A protein has these predicted regions:
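Structural alpha/beta core scaffold segments of enzyme domains
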Residues: 1-180
Length: 180
């Protein structure tokens, strides 16, 4: 084994992780082993395309959303379910499942909120964290639902969204603080 005092990690300024740097991947293990075998430093440099090939993809998500809205478009209740297809391995599935629910009340003022979620192992390619992991799929679903509700109420969807934004320095239904 390589003694710990012989290991030097140089972390360069390369931006945030956003999920893509959360899991250890095969090429990182190979680089460590190559360094042990050669006794020399090993550098990994991936192109943007290679990053997409070797990192995990987004979770397919089955969602059910039931929303209570007043005639003026005020969101009185949101009942949201999300079921994530995690593929064959665990990865950051718990966090992705949590985010599908925890962040749905941040954008708009929601008076009452209920969330249920689960992540399932399947015989598919593994899924994991990606930029905005766990939030992109449900955000799309909620926005489409709000647009349909606005049309049913005879309201402009964009204006209704702007009018219903969560106020600054407020707390969401699940006690997340909105920055002032």
């Amino acid at each position: 084994p390589l003694p710990a005092h012989h290991i030097r990690v140089i972390a360069v300024q390369n931006g945030g992780g956003f999920g893509g740097k959360s899991d250890p991947f095969n090429h990182e293990i190979c680089a460590a082993k190559m360094s042990m075998l050669t006794g020399r430093p090993v550098k990994i440099a991936l192109t943007r395309e290679e990053v997409f090939f070797c990192h995990r993809g987004r979770h397919p998500v089955l969602m059910r959303s039931k929303m209570g809205v007043s005639k003026t478009g005020r969101i009185t209740a949101l009942d949201f379910e999300s079921y994530l297809d995690g593929g064959a391995y665990g990865s950051y599935g718990t966090a992705s499942t949590f985010y599908t629910g925890a962040l749905q009340t941040v954008t708009y003022a929601v008076e009452n909120y209920h969330f249920r979620g689960a992540r399932f192992f399947t015989c598919k390619a593994p899924c994991g964290p990606k930029r905005g992991h766990g939030t992109v799929q449900p955000r799309f679903a909620i926005e489409v639902q709000l647009d349909k509700i606005a049309c049913d109420l005879g309201l402009d969807p964009a204006q209704m969204s702007l009018d219903k934004l969560a106020p600054r320095a407020s707390a969401t239904a699940n006690h997340t603080r909105i920055r002032p």
